[in-house]
């Protein structure tokens, strides 16, 4: 009971080590008691995995998962470690969590946000690419057409990709709405290439920003954000200028209300401005799923077989275990996985859209295949990703190690491959236990941004202004406008009101302590 309610001194030491990135301390504690990996704090129910993922300590994330930490554990707000990693843009942590087969479709309790929403709102395109990797198999896709829409041979896989990308949070806000509002062009471009619905509208009920209105499209949100390129690519991909939201406002009306005057020539219904053609996103990665599946099944360690094994030409440390389809150049699993996860080179110069340039010949890679002589099935346990240097504390062979406190059935279940994602698990309307309230939206790319207070705060401000009779009506209006627009907030407070925000702050205050 002490472990569950946060009364364990050793558990708190592990939390501190995970937060501070103290790998030596964390390993010592887990060697003494592997069950500490499942510890959770008293207030926010954050596990050490949440702390390590939020802070980007990838080696500790791998250590915790190897010692039995639940990769899908939730905190008090229903957020997983994957959501924390996507929130702060730690793509290497996201990659490690995917190797341990985390559930990317889970939504939090506050506003029904998935890891995709957390990555999109803060502009982390690499995290978006990784989160959507399991929905984009390279061997099931044709070439990307000029419209930028992915065409899948298997309709069920296409439907699963489309449903997850367009999964709505509270109020009907999709990841594309969030990226468009904050002017994050790379994320908008990538989401559009991956079947994001350019005509998706927010719900006619629930939360929606008062100054944008319910029933708004991503173009309405992009007009509020003020990013010209985001508006251009939305129009190029089929967004309509004449779409009215529930308030009867066009996108150009939103731009005028928010003083985005530079958008008026583009969004005007009678505009003759030429919309440029946009290429496919540099963050598309077709071979990512193939190398992820190889790493999941066989691990990241290379099996040494004799003296004739080729050494990876990229790292010059490990043996070659996979080969690129097409050019047949061989790499180790780690380098191939790192290449697919970090590359953002325009695919036009190397091959089909979404292909990754081979580091040896620049040929476009669309998939990887394993070398049968170099990988053995005994190495199914995924290891943490340390691309720069091997772990100084790793001793002995870990393939046959087992936790003395975990039964064999649990060990076998953790190594089994995850089932394919069904298209029936997605619900178009997000169920949230908390009532919907006004959404203060963020329109900035950096730092702080204007916020809209709740009606209770506005009434308090009005009473304060009315208490000074010497002020004229014009002065009162200016003061009210300044109070309404002057208060600043960050992008993380977009989708919930006071009650939900207090719950969010309770969880995050532990991590950011």
Curated annotation (Swiss-Prot):
Reactions catalysed: S-ubiquitinyl-[E2 ubiquitin-conjugating enzyme]-L-cysteine + [acceptor protein]-L-lysine = [E2 ubiquitin-conjugating enzyme]-L-cysteine + N(6)-ubiquitinyl-[acceptor protein]-L-lysine
Keywords for the protein's UniProt record, in alphabetical order: ANK repeat, Metal-binding, Repeat, Transferase, Ubl conjugation pathway, Zinc, Zinc-finger
ANK repeats: 44-73, 77-106, 111-140, 171-200, 214-244
Keyword Repeat: yes
Biased composition (Basic and acidic residues): 455-466, 474-483
Biochemical pathway: Protein modification; protein ubiquitination
Region spans: Disordered: 397-417, 455-483
ZnF segments: RING-type: 312-362
GO biological process assignments: protein ubiquitination
Membrane-spanning parts: none
GO molecular function, one term: ubiquitin-protein transferase activity
Keyword Transferase set for record: yes
UniProt xrefs under PANTHER family: ANK_REP_REGION DOMAIN-CONTAINING PROTEIN-RELATED (PTHR24161), PALMITOYLTRANSFERASE HIP14 (PTHR24161:SF85)
Function (record text): Possesses E3 ubiquitin-protein ligase activity when associated with the E2 enzyme UBC8 in vitro.
Protein name, per record: E3 ubiquitin-protein ligase XBAT33
């Amino acid at each position: 009971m002490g472990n569950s309610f946060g009364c364990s001194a050793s558990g708190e030491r592990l939390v501190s080590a995970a937060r501070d990135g103290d790998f030596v301390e964390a390993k010592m504690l887990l060697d003494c008691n592997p069950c500490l990996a499942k510890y959770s704090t008293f207030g926010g129910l954050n596990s050490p995995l949440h702390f390590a993922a939020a802070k980007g300590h990838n080696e500790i994330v791998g250590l915790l998962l190897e010692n039995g930490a639940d990769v899908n554990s939730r905190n008090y707000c229903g957020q997983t470690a994957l959501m924390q990693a996507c929130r702060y843009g730690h793509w290497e942590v996201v990659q490690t969590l995917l190797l341990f087969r985390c559930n990317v479709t889970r939504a939090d309790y506050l506003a029904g946000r998935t890891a995709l929403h957390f990555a999109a709102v803060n502009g982390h395109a690499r995290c978006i690419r990784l989160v959507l990797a399991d929905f984009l198999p390279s061997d099931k896709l044709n070439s990307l057409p000029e419209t930028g829409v992915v065409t899948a041979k298997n309709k069920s896989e296409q439907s699963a990709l489309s449903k997850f990308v367009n999964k709505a949070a509270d109020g009907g806000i999709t990841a594309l709405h969030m990226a468009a509002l904050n002017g994050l062009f790379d994320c908008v471009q990538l989401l559009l290439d991956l079947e994001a619905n350019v005509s998706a509208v927010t719900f006619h009920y629930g939360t929606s920003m008062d100054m944008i209105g319910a029933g708004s499209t991503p173009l309405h949100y992009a007009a509020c954000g003020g990013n010209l390129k985001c508006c251009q690519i939305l129009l190029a991909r089929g967004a309509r200028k004449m779409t009215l939201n529930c308030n009867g406002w066009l996108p150009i009306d939103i731009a005028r209300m928010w003083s985005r005057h530079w958008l008026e020539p583009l969004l005007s219904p009678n505009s003759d401005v030429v919309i440029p053609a946009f290429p496919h996103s540099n963050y598309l990665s077709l071979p990512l799923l193939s190398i992820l599946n190889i790493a999941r099944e066989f691990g990241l360690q290379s099996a040494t077989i004799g003296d004739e094994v080729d050494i990876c030409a990229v790292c010059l440390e490990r043996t070659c275990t996979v080969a690129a389809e097409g050019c047949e150049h061989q790499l180790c699993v780690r380098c191939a996985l790192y290449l697919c996860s970090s590359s953002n080179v325009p695919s036009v110069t190397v091959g089909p859209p979404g292909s990754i340039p081979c580091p040896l010949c620049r040929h476009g890679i669309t998939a990887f295949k394993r070398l049968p002589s170099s990988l053995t099935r005994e190495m199914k346990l995924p290891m943490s990703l340390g691309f720069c240097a091997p772990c100084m504390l790793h001793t002995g062979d870990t393939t046959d190690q087992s936790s003395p406190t975990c039964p064999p059935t649990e060990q076998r279940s953790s190594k089994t491959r995850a089932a394919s994602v069904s298209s029936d698990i997605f619900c178009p309307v997000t169920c949230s236990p908390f009532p919907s309230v006004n959404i203060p939206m963020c329109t900035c790319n950096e730092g702080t941004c204007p916020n809209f207070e709740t009606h209770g705060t506005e009434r308090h401000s009005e009473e304060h202004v009315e208490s000074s009779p010497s002020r004229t009506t014009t002065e009162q209006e200016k003061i009210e406008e300044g109070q309404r627009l002057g208060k600043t907030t960050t992008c993380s407070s977009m989708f919930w009101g006071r009650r939900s925000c207090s719950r969010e702050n309770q969880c995050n205050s532990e991590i950011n302590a």
